[in-house]
């Protein structure tokens, strides 16, 4: 049975057909509508899936935000704009006439990355560092989603009680400091207004402020990982996302994690499926009927 997998992110929409063998084919991508209105998202999703839907028997969605009763929610409403409470499952069922499931994108990616691990690993955590910071937890070989879909939203744990206010309403969340948006928000002077991609480029060119911003992000993530190790006793942590996979970033996280007491050390791995983990994880969950 073929699954039409869809990944809804802050900057892009992706879709692909995924067979029972887990192979990704006919992958398509569009920018996430800038207007962030329900109408714009529905139109973009229609354009994305219309060439693929005839070849699939079901739809599996991995989306930013919390998925509750098939609709979009978020701890940080800024990540969704006008899409809060968007009826995601209902919309795709109407567009495709196919049975549809939906799950948070980081939870989906965690499941895909877990399947790719070698060895006898039953407990792992996936962290995505991108526009925001999200995650997914596998414990005892099972993906934790929670009754309200909140499990794994580790970007909203406390990093600095005196830090910036996060869009979720808390002060000093990991996401407000370590994410691409957090990196950009802290930029000053000639870097003010630059996005995270530009800041990484400038860091590679030797810009001291840019390097400090990236180190601040990596140090914050390392402390989060130490907390995760203490909380879950996971066997490894897999890091993905556009910031997490940026050149040199994971090495910085490893450097700062090594400065923590040995009990909080854990193996760090770069995401195996990189930017397709959400697509594949949603399809795998649909195939296993685990939602």
Swiss-Prot record:
Disulfide bonds: none annotated. This is N-acetylmannosamine kinase. Keywords: ATP-binding, Carbohydrate metabolism, Kinase, Metal-binding, Nucleotide-binding, Transferase, Zinc. Catalyzes the phosphorylation of N-acetylmannosamine (ManNAc) to ManNAc-6-P. CDD domains: ASKHA_NBD_ROK_EcNanK-like (cd24069). It catalyses: an N-acyl-D-mannosamine + ATP = an N-acyl-D-mannosamine 6-phosphate + ADP + H(+). Pathway: Amino-sugar metabolism; N-acetylneuraminate degradation; D-fructose 6-phosphate from N-acetylneuraminate: step 2/5. One of its GO terms (biological process) is N-acetylneuraminate catabolic process. ATP binds at residues 5-12, 132-139. NCBIfam families: NactlManKinNanK, PRK05082.1. Its EC number is 2.7.1.60. One of its GO terms (molecular function) is zinc ion binding. Homodimer. Belongs to the ROK (NagC/XylR) family. NanK subfamily. InterPro entries: ATPase_NBD (IPR043129), ManNAc_kinase_bac (IPR023945), ROK (IPR000600), ROK_cs (IPR049874). Zn(2+) binds at residues 156, 166, 168, 173. The gene is nanK.
């Amino acid at each position: 049975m073929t699954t039409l997998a869809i990944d809804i992110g802050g900057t892009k929409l992706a879709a692909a057909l995924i067979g029972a063998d887990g192979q990704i084919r006919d992958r398509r991508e569009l920018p996430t509508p800038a207007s962030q209105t329900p109408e714009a998202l529905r139109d973009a999703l229609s354009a994305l899936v219309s060439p693929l839907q005839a070849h699939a028997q079901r739809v599996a969605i991995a989306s930013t935000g919390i998925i509750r009763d098939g609709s979009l929610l978020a701890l940080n409403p800024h990540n969704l704009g006008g899409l809060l409470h968007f009826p995601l499952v209902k919309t795709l069922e109407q567009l495709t006439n196919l049975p549809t499931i939906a799950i948070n994108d980081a939870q989906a990616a965690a499941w895909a990355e877990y399947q790719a691990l070698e060895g006898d690993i039953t407990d792992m955590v996936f962290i995505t560092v991108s526009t925001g910071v999200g995650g997914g937890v596998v414990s005892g070989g099972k993906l934790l989603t929670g009754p309200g879909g909140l499990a794994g939203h580790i970007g909203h744990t406390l990093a600095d009680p005196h830090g910036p206010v996060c869009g979720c309403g808390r002060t000093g969340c990991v996401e407000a400091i370590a994410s691409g948006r957090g990196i950009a928000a802290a930029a000053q002077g000639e870097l003010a207004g630059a996005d995270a991609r530009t800041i990484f480029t400038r860091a590679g060119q030797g810009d001291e402020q840019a390097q400090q911003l990236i180190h601040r992000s990596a140090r914050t993530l390392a402390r989060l990982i130490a907390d995760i190790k203490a909380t879950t006793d996971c066997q490894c942590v897999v890091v993905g996302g556009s910031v997490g996979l940026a050149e040199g970033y994971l090495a910085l996280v490893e450097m700062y994690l090594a400065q923590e007491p040995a009990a909080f050390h854990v193996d760090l791995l770069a995401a195996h499926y990189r930017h397709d983990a959400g697509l594949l994880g949603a399809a795998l969950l649909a195939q296993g009927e685990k939602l």
